[in-house]
Amino acid sequence: MKLPGKIAIMGGGSWATAIAKMCLAQEESINWYMRRDDRIADFKRLGHNPAYLTGVKFDMKRINFSSNINDVVKESDTLIFVTPSPYLKAHLKKLKTRIRDKFIITAIKGIVPDDNLIVSEYFNKEYGVPPENIAVLAGPCHAEEVALERLSYLTIACPDKDKARVFARRLGSSFIKTSVSDDVIGIEYSSVLKNVYAIAAGICSGLKYGDNFQAVLISNAIQEMNRFLNTVHPINRNVDESVYLGDLLVTGYSNFSRNRTFGTMIGKGYSVKSAQIEMEMIAEGYYGTKCIKEINKHHHVNTVSYTHLTL
């Protein structure tokens, strides 16, 4: 099976930049949607993203930039969305071009606020994209380490595993190894939950609770995550795999983790607003806590560690 044509990156942050680097290891060229014309102009002038992963150089001849989302969608077949979940709906407001026939890949590790839908469900319900044309890109893979070409491992999940395998081959490289799964729902929810638990780990760090306490927290977190996933989407899965446990560990412990950093600042006494301003990046877990709390009202999963964050 061959996925058709051109890949488009939909977003301009650090993770979008890292994914663009991965794609260009295999693709001759890509389309790239960024909302701001001034950011595109600076990118073209400098040869790198002016705001994120500035050490990653790109060949401008291989990238077709545009701030017009409809033009990018029309000229692309596979759309990789890498917009922070709180802003996804705003980014899509200007979208008039039909996307139900496109192959959608979400690399967004969050829930669409107000709707309380994981991103794959949102594209299915709002835009009519069939589930077999939606994939999720996830795993223990920080953008900063991709920039440094450190060995990383990603999972591509799609109900149609043949499509997942095709994209996995297009994304793999000497420093990116890939696997495939069909657990779209479980992987999306685990990507949300691990950000929430990383904030908790950061708070513990900021409070100087120590490594022993954090080890217990993360141990409890994977058990809670397993209970939640088995309730929301009960299938036969192994949460010890890297896309679940591995992503939780790297997000909970790594200094590259923006959610852990956000939590550490809260633990040190920052207000939420002041932490957000100083970070200049989105900690998805902050928004995810409220969404998961609402979703769990329908499922009543016992999540003691998580519940303390939402009090």
Where are these regions (language model features)?
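Short, conserved catalytic or adaptor-binding loops enriched in Gly and charged residues
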Residues: 53-61, 127-128, 170-171
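Internal alpha-helical scaffold of NAD(P)-dependent oxidoreductase catalytic cores
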Residues: 87, 98, 125-133, 151-238
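Short, conserved active-site loop motifs that form the nucleotide-linked donor/cofactor pocket
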Residues: 62-64, 176
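NAD(P)+-binding Rossmann beta1-loop-alpha1 motif at the extreme N-terminus of oxidoreductases
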Residues: 1-56, 64
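Interdomain hinge/lid region at the active-site interface
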Residues: 197-306
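Rossmann-like NAD(P)(H) cofactor-binding subdomain of soluble oxidoreductases
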Residues: 66-74, 78-151, 167-169
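Conserved small/polar residues in nucleotide/adenosyl-binding loops
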Residues: 307-311
